[in-house]
Amino acid sequence: MLKTPETEHGIVNRVTGSVFAYQGWPSVCRDENGVLYAVASSFRTEHICPFGKTAMYISKNGGQTGTPPIVINDTYLDDRDAGIVYMGHGRMLVTWFCHPAEVYETQYYNPIKNSAQPSEAGPSLGMLASYRHLPADRLQGGSFVRVSEDYGVTWSETIRLPVSAPHGPSVLDDGTLIYLGKELYSSTCETPEEPG
């Protein structure tokens, strides 16, 4: 007989009173002290928008409560699909990816314009219009990681990777990272299909 684990449901963090209240695709890990670290693409207006930031939430009581969002990554692009893995001794790795600005300007422009609430359309379309004034190196998409050596207090510079997976790598028993993902916005990769 299949035994159902005991669960408790509740809300640990909810953003209210802001057009940037959408938070999506969380990942969580736990350190040797039982502290939970969750990351998500936060401060968004909707599923497809130009605003996502990688935010971390820390819980020291098993997920009953958590810190307010701590922004650990905020590029000019939409930082999506944050992943986190704990590697031991205070060391953790966060992953995310960004579509290039060109994808938003071509493939996602109309879906954003047509699906956004009126209060979201202005900021979203304004952000897309600002891309033409930014340096080209800030508008390239890709898959990225940052590493913390001090339980998420500080983070390394951004490291670009050729693959992406929504929740990042896993740690093997010997401490080696294994990262199975899809090639995304590397020099030999194509852009994604247009949303349906």
Regions found by a protein language model. Give the residues of each.
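Asp-box/BNR beta-propeller blade signature and adjacent active/binding-site loops
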Residues: M1-G196
